């Protein structure tokens, strides 16, 4: 199943978090926080103004992004857990 976001929504794949701390301690799965970094998998066309004019998206597929801890809605696509969020939930692009 392919999923294309609508309007100003973005589909994001979370990046994997570190398995160890800087001191070498292994972090168990139960103690790991979900990462707030990810890669844009797909984007909608963008939002529209009241006049109907399209507002272009600031992110594109493949961008590494930073988003809020509680951003987005978890969705499962082809057995993979992804996040669907509005572009405004994205804090920035990692360059």
Curated annotation (Swiss-Prot):
Gene Ontology terms: biological process: chaperone cofactor-dependent protein refolding
CDD domains noted in UniProt: cpn10
Record carries keyword Electron transport: no
SMART domains in the cross-refs: Cpn10 (SM00883)
GO molecular function: ATP binding; metal ion binding; protein folding chaperone; protein-folding chaperone binding; unfolded protein binding
GO cellular component, one term: cytoplasm
Keywords in alphabetical order: Chaperone, Cytoplasm
Subcellular location: Cytoplasm
Chief site of localization: cytoplasm
Pfam families (alphabetical): Cpn10
Keyword Lipid metabolism on entry: no
InterPro entries linked: Chaperonin_GroES (IPR020818), Chaperonin_GroES_sf (IPR037124), Chaprnonin_Cpn10_CS (IPR018369), GroES-like_sf (IPR011032)
Job of this protein: Together with the chaperonin GroEL, plays an essential role in assisting protein folding. The GroEL-GroES system forms a nano-cage that allows encapsulation of the non-native substrate proteins and provides a physical environment optimized to promote and accelerate protein folding. GroES binds to the apical surface of the GroEL ring, thereby capping the opening of the GroEL channel.
HAMAP family reported for this sequence: CH10
Similarity comment: family membership: Belongs to the GroES chaperonin family.
Oligomer and partners: Heptamer of 7 subunits arranged in a ring. Interacts with the chaperonin GroEL.
Protein's recorded name: Co-chaperonin GroES
Upper lineage: Bacteria, Pseudomonadati, Pseudomonadota, Alphaproteobacteria, Rhodobacterales
Gene that specifies this protein: groES
